[in-house]
Amino acid sequence: MGAILLLEDGRRFVGQAFGAVTTRVGEAVFNTAMSGYQEVLTDPSYAEQVVCMTAPHIGNTGINLEDEESERVHVAGFLVRSLSHAPSNWRSTGGLHRYLAERGVPGMQGLDTRALVRHLRDKGAMRCVVSTDGTSEAALREQLGAWPGMVGRNLAVEVACKAPWVSSDPKQPTVRFAVLDGGIKRNILRLLGDTGAYVRVHPITDPASAFTDGVDAVLVGNGPGDPAALTGPVGELRSVLGKLPVVGICLGHQLLALALGAETYKLKFGHRGANQPVRDERTGRVEITSQNHGFGVEPKSLAATGAVVTHTHLNDHTISGFVHPGKRVFAVQYHPEAAPGPHDSRSILLHQFVRFAQGIDP
């Protein structure tokens, strides 16, 4: 069966369908990771995005039940150059086609992914519609025009947990973390628990519930959408700055910058992949990191808050981390849990978070 991808600027791509027979609208983005497609599919930060993988062969290792980053697939659509129909891995329980079909997500293979990625790189991430059910192009254009886009969208509330729950409860915790969930990945919680920390997760819709007695620090996790749309959580975070150590990852990095009084903005095509170079400005050490975001922190506005940039993305020199000692804030834009991705920052940064929660400067 044929499939079609229409971009808001009129560009058109055709290919073959896999996954669900349906039509979905979203934001067209690309990911440069060579592997880890199952983590990408189930990462809540990809809510309402149609993801194109730059690696040519996808699906080689099949699907397993251990690598999912949440309870469901969050991407709106999945685009690949070549889909593997014979996955091989000792953990595999099935193939990518059936996995997406059972979850109602359309896939498209055989399109010129290189041309698409170069187009998005030059023109920027944009609205799109992907269809595998034969809907007419006129109807697809109508659906595309009705989709509101990402700017101003508070998608974090749609993927957050509904009530507080405990992720890790050791007998003698090294530190007690309250985590704000606006789409946090399972591996962040797992690895934070591996440091010996007590971890209690709270919905980002009710951040005040996290700021209770007995908590040593707050971690604000990753998530989808426009950070500037989360005015309620930003205000709640502002009220706790300076009272408790607060650390942030990805969306949490952006929300903490807003809470300090800085501004955020939409990146042209974002940073999505497991090969993103970041320099630690304190040591000069360069780490290859995993990233997934479409918004960044505006440098001049952050500097005006008194925060100090600790990490810089070497591809475009955007801010990848900052600290504000006076407000007890430490945040990074990248994903230290590295799922998928390299482990350059994995143990170092998570243990820095724990030490920061214990009152030791990062």
Regions found by a protein language model. Name each.
Residues 7, 30, 52-53, 80, ...:
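General beta-strand structural signal in soluble alpha/beta enzymes
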Residues 219-229:
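Short glycine/threonine-rich loop/turn motifs
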Residues 22-31:
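A short, polar/charged loop-to-alpha-helix boundary motif
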Residues 1-9, 14:
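Acidic, glycine-enriched active-site microenvironments
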Residues 198-204:
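Short hydrophobic/Thr-rich beta-strand motif most characteristic of the beta2 strand and flanking loop
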Residues 35-38, 44, 58, 63-93, ...:
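Amide-donor transfer/coupling interface in amidating biosynthetic enzymes
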Residues 248, 252, 257:
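Gly/Ala-rich beta-loop-alpha elbow adjacent to hydrolase catalytic centers
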